[in-house]
Each structure stands twice: as structure tokens, then as C-alpha cells.
Amino acid sequence: MKTILFILTFLLCENGYAQTTPSSKVFKPVELYQSNNLIVIQVSENAFVHTSYLQTNDFGNVPCNGMIVRNSNEAIVFDTPTNDSSANELIKFINEKLHCKVNAIVPTHFHSDCLGGLAAFHKQNIPSFANFSTIELTKVNNVVNPQNGFKDDLKLSLGKTFAMVNYFGQGHTKDNVVGYFPSENILFGGCLIKELDATKGYLGDANVGAWSNTVEKIKKQYPNLKIVIPGHGAIGGSELLDYTIQLFKAN
């Protein structure tokens, strides 16, 4: 089942979303790593999607996306794999195959598909950064706490460039943030952004009434995105923002 899910996701990326890098070369997504627990796909010159799996009662074995961005042998990871074992696998891949040191891990909200492997990053002395609300919610839910908090926006140095973390408002959860890689105009939307044709998914901690408005703010801030990575499913472009806005608009 995992392999089938991967192939479907990869083919959608391969056939539908070849992207243009800053050097104007067409970049087609390519699989760099696959095991039973982890997949890594390169989606641009310096951005990668990592996918791990979360067993759930309501939705089965769910593939969960995160993002890696790199520059000058440094990397930042958005969302951990779903457990410590897969997180260690990812860190090893980044160190040994991408030849990068991980500067930071950023969980984009408090659910386990974002920080289930956080302890593995801490054990390897990789600092974590999260919305203050995320830190409070991890304390309430008795899970591993991110180490460093911020309120609305955070700029993280990455080699000769940087990555941004932004809070635009409530949606999937009240604490959800997004990651943005300006040098390649890539957004990691996490669970706030849906793949095309997705259902609304888990709404147990959601603010459905605010969701569309929050995504509209993202679209206004970043109107010309080249790649958008959702928390689950296939990557795309700004049409994923449009789809998510319409999905949660009040009837």
C-alpha cells in the first residue's frame, strides 16, 4: 500500500509539476531515497519532500509530507517524520547523501505528523523552532516540546540565504504555520493546505470558519509560488491554495 501511494504521488509530481529553477532549467521531481518507512523526493535544485507514515484509526496508514531546504551544505527541515526511527533515517540521509548539516527543525503544528520524531532531532543537538502556541499545545498534550518559540514570523539563516516561517491564522489547528523558501519561491503549507481533490480530513482541532481566510492571506503574501507542498499528498502550485480556499468556504 505504501508503494502504491508513493507511485501515485510521484507520478502526479513527475507528469504535472516540473518546475523552473532560478537558472531557468526545467527540474523534474526525482526520487532520491525509499525505504519501508521513508521516501525523499527532490522537487527543485535545493528543496526536497520527505514522506513518512502515520497509522490512524479513521484514515488508515497516512503518508505525511515534510520539506527539506538546503544551501551551502546547511539544511532546514519542516516537520519531522512521524516517529523517532524515521527521523533518524532522515537525518542520516541529509548528513550522508545531501552532505548537509541540519541547522533547524520546524514543526508546523502540534500534531504527531509534524513532531512525532522531534526527540530524535533534539538527541542529535538539532535546535527546534515553533509557534509559541505550538509549544503550549505540546505541553497540554504531554508530547515533546519544541525548544524555541516565536509569535508570528521567523527568519532562519541557511548558508548564503534564508527560510521563513509565517503564521497567517487558524485553520487545520489554531497554531498552524507555513514555511517559505524565497530563493526558489516554494511554500510548505503543511496540513493547512490540501492536495487537489482532497477531502477536509481531520477536523478535531480545526477552525473551519477561519480556514479559507487564512489561506487567502497566504495567497496575497505569496502570489506567484512555483511549488506548493501540502501536508499530505501530491505537490502542485498556487492552485492548491485556490482549492483549499474553496473547500472551506462557507456555503
Q: What are the functions of these language-model segments?
A:
Residues N46, V69, D79, I94, ...:
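Divalent metal-coordination and catalytic microenvironments
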Residues N88, K92, E96, A119, ...:
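Solvent-exposed, polar/charged alpha-helical surfaces in well-ordered, non-transmembrane soluble domains
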Residues M1-T21:
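Bacterial Sec-dependent N-terminal signal peptides
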Residues S72-I76, S85-F129:
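Active-site metal-binding motif and surrounding structural segment of the metallo-beta-lactamase
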Residues G16-S35:
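Sec-dependent signal peptide cleavage junction
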Residues S35-N37, Q42, E74-A75, T82-N83, F129-Y243, ...:
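Metallo-beta-lactamase
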Residues Q42-I91, V178-C191:
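Conserved beta-strand hairpin/beta-sheet module of binuclear metal-dependent hydrolase folds
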